[in-house]
């Protein structure tokens, strides 16, 4: 253990020197098939040549300039996002946590400007994850996140996942918004059915409150659409974005309709690094690659191949696996063995997966993973399951 680093992570005894596509390599040259992609961050794999070119080209011109000035790369990326989404405007951050913070501020400022400052309560859901800031952990509400950190930021109402009647019963004169992940990632790859998201949109319209979706993990092509909420045909008022949009470079965003963002005027929010030229140059290239029908269709095709293979593994190893969850390339395997045992045994088979709540192992590969790599991943997952069976 490196004692000079704050021990907030229970790190695996692995260190990587370089990456290429869906592979990570140690200094000894050992290759690991990365089915986690930095927890849905490396949307186009490691060291993608087009992203490297976008980054290095910009690095040779300008790294940072304050948001006191116009930033052409930021303006271009914002235009791309507005042109292809529900949003009318964008604010750039460096992470999903920062995006959550702004979404909370935006919701509350919206009501303050309407003369209804008492409307501060945001409905959130059990199993959710919205980052590790004070607002983020208060929004999620899990004791695992909040224990020991003193009084929580008030104004969050935590409800059971996808219980329409409970949600409507909780809406009152203090309710400002509903905040939800279309697919819970940390919560165990729990997919909100399309009809439920439609129902939330209807509830928000009925009671004149805002709908905010957290697409930090499930957005940027991961489900076969640019954003997961698109499958339901609804438009949120606010969306939080990060992870895949930067392809591995720190970048996040909050997308908003004009009405929802109406309270965010000069001086109400800011970011030193948010929307810097380096990050936005990479983000532009990510969107240009991912947001095409051909690319998004390929995600759906690859999802079908992985899912078919996983179903075969469940049939063959019913003592190890219980069910498959998710959609696109945001998949989860609920295990019967401890999920951490599976992840750790995977290290021995040189495959990287990601644990989640509810004893789930996440598969979040690069969106451009090849068919050959999918077959190799399924083989290594089977080897892992077989080793755990033998060890029983």
Where are the language model's segments positioned?
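Conserved N-terminal phosphate-binding loop of PLP-dependent enzymes in the Aspartate aminotransferase
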Residues: 1-392
């Amino acid at each position: 253990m490196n004692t000079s680093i704050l021990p907030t992570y229970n790190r695996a005894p692995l260190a990587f020197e370089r990456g290429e596509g869906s592979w990570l390599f140690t200094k000894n040259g050992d290759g690991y098939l990365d089915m986690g992609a930095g927890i849905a961050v490396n949307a186009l794999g490691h060291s993608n040549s087009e992203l490297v070119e976008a980054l290095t080209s910009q690095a040779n011109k300008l790294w940072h300039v304050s948001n006191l000035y116009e930033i052409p790369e930021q303006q271009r990326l914002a235009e791309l996002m507005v042109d292809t989404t529900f949003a009318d405007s964008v604010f750039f951050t460096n992470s999903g946590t920062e995006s959550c913070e702004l979404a909370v501020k935006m919701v509350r400022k919206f009501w303050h400007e309407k003369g209804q400052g008492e409307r501060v309560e945001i409905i959130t859901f059990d199993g959710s994850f919205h980052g590790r800031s004070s607002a983020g952990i208060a929004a999620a509400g899990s004791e695992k996140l909040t224990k020991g950190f003193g009084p929580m930021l008030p104004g969050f109402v935590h409800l059971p996942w996808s219980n329409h009647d409970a949600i409507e019963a909780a809406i009152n004169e203090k309710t400002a918004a509903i905040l939800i992940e279309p697919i819970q990632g940390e919560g165990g790859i729990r997919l909100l059915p399309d009809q439920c998201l439609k129902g939330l949109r209807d509830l928000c319209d009925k009671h004149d409150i805002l709908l905010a979706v957290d697409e930090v993990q499930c957005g940027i092509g991961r489900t076969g659409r640019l954003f997961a909420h698109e499958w339901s045909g609804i438009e949120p008022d606010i969306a939080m974005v990060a992870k895949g949009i930067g392809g591995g470079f720190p970048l996040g965003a909050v997308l908003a309709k004009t009405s929802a963002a109406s309270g965010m005027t000069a001086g109400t929010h800011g970011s030193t690094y948010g929307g810097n030229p380096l990050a936005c140059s990479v983000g532009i290239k990510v969107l240009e690659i991912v947001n095409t029908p051909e690319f998004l269709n390929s995600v759906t095709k690859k999802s079908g191949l992985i899912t078919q293979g996983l179903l075969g593994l469940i049939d063959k190893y019913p003592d190890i696996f219980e069910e498959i969850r998710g959609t696109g390339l945001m998949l989860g395997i609920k295990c019967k063995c401890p999920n951490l045992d599976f992840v750790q045994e995977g290290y021995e088979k040189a495959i990287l997966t990601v644990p989640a709540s509810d004893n789930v192992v996440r598969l979040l590969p690069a969106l451009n993973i090849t068919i050959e790599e999918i077959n190799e991943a399924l083989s290594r997952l089977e080897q892992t399951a077989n080793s755990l069976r033998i060890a029983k």
